[in-house]
Curated annotation (Swiss-Prot):
Enzyme Commission designation: 2.8.1.8
This protein's record includes keyword Cell membrane: no
Pathway the protein acts in: Protein modification; protein lipoylation via endogenous pathway; protein N(6)-(lipoyl)lysine from octanoyl-[acyl-carrier-protein]: step 2/2
Descriptive protein name: Lipoyl synthase 1
PROSITE patterns xref list: RADICAL_SAM
Originating species: Parasynechococcus marenigrum (strain WH8102)
Chain's gene name: lipA1
Length: 289
C-alpha cells in the first residue's frame, strides 16, 4: 500500500541531526526516535529535542506493530544511565523532556526506580525543565506507579495504543481496562499531574471505535490525547489497514476538544505521542494546577 502525499516528510537538517545524534552517542543514550524508527526524527532532532528511551534498547514484549527489538533476557539496570540522561538534558538546553522506556516485565517494579532516578537527575541538572514520562503498564503494579508519581513528573503519559477489539492482535500482553485504570489512578491520586494517552489508527479499527476510545479516555479523566497514523516498520510487522485522511484526523480533534472536553487533542497523520511535546508547557500555563 503506497503512502499518500500527506505522509511525506521533509528532508531533515543534517547538521542539527548530527549534533544531537553525536551527543546521544557520546553519552551512550537511546532514543525512541531512533529505536522505533519515528517518522519525525528529522524535525525533532533538528529542533534539538529527543525522547529518551531508558532501560533498553531491548523490550520484554513483542508487540507486532513496534520496531523496538524483543529481548526476554534478564538484564541489570545501568546505574549510570540517569546521570548521563540528566547531562544530556542540560547540554541540549531542553525546556521540556520526555522520558520513556521499554517494557521491563523481568523487573519486580517494572523499572519504576530507574524512572525516579532519571527524574531526580533532570531536576538537579536542569531545574526549570518540565518532565513528561511515557510509562508502561507495570503489569498492574500500582505500588510501582506510586513510586514514579512520588517523584512528581509534570505529565504522565501511558498510551492506550489501539481500540479494545484490536488488543489481541496488536497488543497481546496488554489489557485495555488495566491501561484505563492506570490513567484514572493518576488523576485521582495525583491531581496536580497532567495525564496523557495516545493511540494509532490504521490498524483495522473503525472511526466509531476511535471515538469510543476517546470517550473512555475522557471518562477516566485523561487531559491530553495524541492520535497518529500507524506506519508498519517492515514485512514482519502488522500491515497498514488504511490511511486515515487529514480531514478525519481533524474530526477526531474536534470531537475530542469541543464535544468531549479534553484540554488538548493533537491529531494529525504524523503525530506520535511525544511529537511537539514541548507545547505541553503552554497548556500547563493556560491550565495551571
Amino acid at each position: 500500500m503506497l503512502k499518500p502525499e500527506w505522509l511525506r516528510v521533509k528532508a531533515p537538517q543534517r547538521e542539527r541531526i548530527g549534533a544531537v545524534a553525536d551527543l546521544l552517542l557520546d553519552l551512550n543514550l537511546n532514543t525512541v526516535c531512533q529505536e522505533a524508527s519515528c517518522p519525525n526524527i528529522g524535525e525533532c532532532f533538528a529542533g534539538g529535542t529527543a525522547t529518551f528511551l531508558i532501560m533498553g534498547p531491548g523490550c520484554t514484549r513483542a508487540c507486532p506493530y513496534c520496531d523496538i527489538d524483543f529481548d526476554k533476557s534478564v538484564r541489570e539496570l545501568d546505574p549510570t544511565e540517569p546521570e548521563r540522561l540528566g547531562e544530556a538534558v542540560a547540554r541540549l538546553g531542553l525546556k521540556h523532556v520526555v522520558i520513556t522506556s521499554v517494557n521491563r516485565d523481568d523487573l519486580p517494579d517494572g523499572g519504576a526506580t530507574q524512572f525516579v532516578a532519571c527524574i531526580e537527575q533532570v531536576k538537579q541538572r536542569s531545574p526549570l525543565t518540565t518532565i513528561e514520562l511515557l510509562i508502561p503498564d507495570f503489569c498492574g503494579n500500582w505500588d510501582a506507579l506510586a513510586t514514579v508519581m512520588a517523584a512528581a513528573p509534570h505529565v504522565l503519559n501511558h498510551n492506550i495504543e489501539t481500540v479494545p477489539r484490536m488488543y489481541r492482535l496488536a497488543r497481546p500482553q496488554g489489557i485495555y481496562e488495566r491501561s484505563l485504570e492506570l490513567l484514572q489512578r493518576v488523576r485521582d491520586d495525583w491531581p496536580r499531574a497532567y495525564s496523557k494517552s495516545g493511540l494509532m489508527v490504521g490498524l483495522g479499527e473503525t472511526d466509531d471505535e476511535v471515538i469510543d476510545v476517546l470517550r473512555d479516555l475522557r471518562t477516566h479523566r485523561v487531559d491530553i490525547v495524541t492520535i497518529g497514523q500507524y506506519l508498519s516498520p517492515g514485512p514482519k510487522h502488522l500491515a497498514v489497514d488504511r490511511f486515515v485522511t487529514p480531514e478525519q484526523f481533524d474530526t477526531y480533534r474536534r470531537i475530542g476538544e469541543e464535544e468531549l472536553g479534553f484540554l488538548q487533542v493533537v491529531s494529525t497523520p504524523l503525530t506520535r505521542s511525544s511529537y511537539h511535546a514541548g507545547e505541553v508547557q503552554r497548556l500547563m500555563a493556560s491550565h495551571p494546577r
